[in-house]
């Protein structure tokens, strides 16, 4: 950000008017308020709220199970990988690992991938990228994961669900 002359401010903010934002700053990556307030004047404002991974309660703790941050730190490419969630971040990870040689399945409980963007844009993306994945299971939920020595066995429910658990390396 500094190389592009962008100031990053972390905290809780509210707009005072169309060109001013008051921010109550927080410490580091935590949400603890420092008490310091800053008023920022701008012509154009980008709000990058970030995201946090959802940890599903039925998924066991296992080093082969990672969130999107952990997926960026893998030292080797798994042979077969499941991506839970067909949103932008999940599909970004799926595309990266497919390009690196992993066989990828994507499971999404909604009826389409990427719920936020324009549907026509998503269709273009799907047409250009669907070949990268072994399976895209829509209207399907992950309902169980069993971590065994030889792999992760995943159970699904829904329209695109396989009848038996499927084995994944990650």
Residue ranges and their predicted role:
Residues 1-7:
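A structural motif corresponding to the C-terminal end of an alpha-helix
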Residues 7-10, 14-33, 40, 101-170:
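A Rossmann-like FAD-binding core segment of flavoenzymes
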Residues 44-102, 107, 132, 136:
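Glycine-rich dinucleotide-binding loop and its adjacent helix/turn
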């Amino acid at each position: 950000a500094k190389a592009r002359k962008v100031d990053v401010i972390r905290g809780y903010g509210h707009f005072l008017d169309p060109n001013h934002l008051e921010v109550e700053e927080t410490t580091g990556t935590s949400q603890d308020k420092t008490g310091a307030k800053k008023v920022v004047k701008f012509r154009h404002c980008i709000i990058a709220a970030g995201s946090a991974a959802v940890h599903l309660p039925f998924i066991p703790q296992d080093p082969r199970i990672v969130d999107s941050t952990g997926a960026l730190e893998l030292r080797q490419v798994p042979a077969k990988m499941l991506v839970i969630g067909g949103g932008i971040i999940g599909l970004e990870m799926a595309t990266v690992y497919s390009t690196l040689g992993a066989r990828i399945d994507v499971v999404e409980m909604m009826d389409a991938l990427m719920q936020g963007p324009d549907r026509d844009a998503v269709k273009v993306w799907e047409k250009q990228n669907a070949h990268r994945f072994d399976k895209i299971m829509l209207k399907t939920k992950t309902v169980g994961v069993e971590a065994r020595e030889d792999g992760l066995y995943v159970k699904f429910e829904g329209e695109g669900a396989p009848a038996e658990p499927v084995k994944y390396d990650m």
